[in-house]
């Protein structure tokens, strides 16, 4: 895809269908042979009943008869088609999938065939007369058991061909599991797979929080755009799949670990290499090193040589391990800047006058206090040579900066830390709320101030259903009890649900009112509309800074 995830739209009737390319059977045979020569076995995954938009766009007769929407393909989450899956009530669906699997098994000699089984929304199955009739005929209690039937039927077919089956941990949602199926645990740090282990099934750990390589692998200010928060090289290295509270028999059923790289979040092959390397080396350490023998410092020394090998091979890899993660926290009227690097063998040097840091600049040894507008720059060094990118932190002071925020959300302290967020909503500079319908926080200015304008920094990321609020209200008080409204602004759905990824300021005129306490209340925009790439899902609000003048 040449369109970033946050710009992707739902497919509409009449639009030209994008052709993303395909592999011939000869291409696949060549790849299988190439991998086998290097002692690698390629395991194909044919997703069912969900994550199947491409097949269903080509063969719409395989969906439930109650589906009345246009079936298009939006890579990733499926857009408005995310709930369109194979119909479990049509025998033609199973015949089609058996034919597909016959072709797949003919060109992939792997011992295992992966059948997917994850993230299947059952809304259409609940309405479909064919699916409901299937449930009655097979004496199935609910739609989860209908998926269990679906997966068992296809699993039995694969096993009849002498292969073994792998499936995602949603298969454990059913009251029964296909015989011999191997479960991949991705939800709840992989814990969902333990439900299968309880029944004696083997499993593979691939927890999304640790082993999904689409996450940022370093301080996000330096990283190309991806999704879902941080997952650093050290996060991967520190992961231990065998947990102390496991039953003894679980460990013997654990087959190994897997890192997952979902390429629909990438725009070119180099993006994939960048996200995979060098975290792949950390994954290998997790798989083959006993916990007592793991040593982060020793691993880094070996990794330096490994990275030289990648360079010689022309492989684009991330040097994120050398970059600095910052934390700026209000504390008693000042800001404290904390700088960290995951490599303990790096020195951090910094400046506060806007100049570029060098190996002779002040050495970072403790939190740096900031009391005014300035630009702090820092970088990592080893043996006098700069190793990472320069972190540039523009601190901008206003009446709210370093003032306490009176609320129940710990992240609200970010709203007065003088630092603006980036286009990455998970960069640790954006504040979000669990309940977007009733966002409210109060800033204590510590003394009465004349207030002319309050500006809220707000981010839109259409692909992640992040939008500005439906309304914002500002109230002012002298005693934190009796508040008077100072400003109110509302936005239309057209203004709210815009496409793209961008930051905007929401200014509210306060007209010179005076007060010590400033309360900001925001109402969430609600559910994403039908035309949205995440239609039907709840939208979210993210603010980075409150600026009071």
Where do the PLM segments sit?
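Aromatic- and acidic-residue-enriched carbohydrate-binding clefts of CAZyme catalytic domains
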Residues: 1-37, 54-95, 123-143
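Short, solvent-exposed turn/loop segments enriched in Gly/Ser/Thr/Pro and often Arg
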Residues: 46-54, 116-121, 169-171, 209
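Active-site neighborhood of glycoside hydrolase catalytic domains
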Residues: 77, 81-180, 187-195
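Short, compositionally stereotyped local motifs that mark structural "simplifiers"
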Residues: 290, 294, 300-440, 459, ...
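Aromatic, loop-rich ligand-recognition surfaces of beta-strand-rich domains
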Residues: 424-487, 502-549
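Solvent-exposed serine/threonine-rich low-complexity stretches and specific carbohydrate-binding patches
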Residues: 485-496
């Amino acid at each position: 895809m040449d369109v970033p995830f946050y710009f992707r739209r739902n497919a509409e009737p009449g639009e030209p269908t994008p052709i993303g390319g395909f592999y011939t059977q000869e291409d696949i045979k060549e790849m299988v042979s190439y991998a086998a020569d290097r002692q690698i076995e390629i395991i194909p995954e044919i997703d069912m009943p969900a994550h199947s938009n491409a097949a269903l766009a080509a063969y719409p007769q395989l969906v439930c008869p109650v589906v009345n929407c246009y079936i298009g393909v939006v890579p990733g989450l499926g857009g408005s088609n995310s709930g369109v899956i194979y119909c479990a009530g049509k025998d033609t669906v199973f015949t089609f999938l058996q034919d597909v699997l016959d072709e797949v098994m003919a060109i992939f000699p792997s011992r295992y065939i992966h059948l997917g089984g994850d993230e299947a929304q059952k809304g259409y199955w609940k309405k479909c007369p064919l699916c409901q009739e299937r449930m009655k005929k097979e004496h199935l209690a609910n739609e989860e058991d209908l998926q269990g039937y679906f997966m068992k039927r296809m699993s039995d077919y694969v096993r009849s061909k002498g292969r073994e089956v792998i499936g995602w941990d949603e298969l454990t949602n059913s009251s029964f599991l296909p015989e011999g199926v191997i479960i991949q645990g991705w939800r709840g740090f992989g814990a969902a797979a333990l439900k299968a282990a309880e029944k004696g099934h083997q499993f593979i750990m691939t927890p999304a929080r640790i082993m999904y390589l689409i996450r940022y692998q370093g301080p996000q200010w330096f990283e190309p755009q991806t999704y879902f928060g941080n997952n650093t090289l050290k996060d991967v290295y520190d992961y231990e799949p065998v947990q102390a509270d496991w039953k003894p028999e679980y460990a013997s059923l654990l087959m190994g670990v897997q890192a997952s790289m979902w390429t629909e979040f990438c725009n070119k092959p180099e993006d994939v290499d960048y996200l995979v390397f060098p975290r792949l080396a950390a994954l290998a350490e997790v798989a083959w090193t006993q916990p007592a023998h793991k040593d982060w410092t020793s691993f880094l020394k070996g990794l330096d040589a490994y990275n030289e090998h990648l360079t010689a091979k022309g492989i684009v890899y991330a040097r994120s391990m050398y970059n600095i993660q910052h934390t700026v926290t209000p504390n008693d009227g000042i800001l404290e800047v904390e700088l960290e690097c995951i490599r303990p063998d790096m020195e951090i040097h910094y400046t506060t006058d806007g100049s570029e840091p060098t190996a002779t600049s002040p050495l970072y040894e403790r939190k740096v206090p900031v009391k005014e507008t300035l630009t702090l720059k820092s970088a990592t060094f080893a043996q006098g040579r700069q190793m990472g990118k320069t972190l540039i932190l523009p601190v901008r002071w206003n009446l709210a900066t370093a003032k306490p925020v009176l609320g129940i959300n710990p992240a609200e302290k970010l709203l007065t830390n003088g630092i603006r967020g980036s286009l990455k909503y998970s960069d640790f500079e954006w504040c979000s709320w669990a309940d977007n319908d009733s966002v409210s926080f109060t800033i204590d200015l510590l003394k009465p101030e004349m207030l002319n304008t309050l500006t809220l920094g707000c981010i839109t990321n259409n692909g992640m259903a992040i939008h500005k609020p439906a309304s914002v209200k500002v109230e002012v008080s002298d005693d934190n009890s009796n508040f008077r409204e100072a400003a109110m602004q509302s936005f239309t759905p057209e203004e709210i649900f815009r496409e793209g990824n961008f930051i905007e300021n929401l200014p509210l005129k306060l007209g010179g009112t005076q007060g010590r306490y400033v309360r900001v209340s925001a109402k969430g925009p609600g559910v994403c509309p039908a035309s949205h790439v995440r239609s039907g899902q709840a939208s979210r609000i993210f603010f980075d800074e409150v600026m009071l003048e």
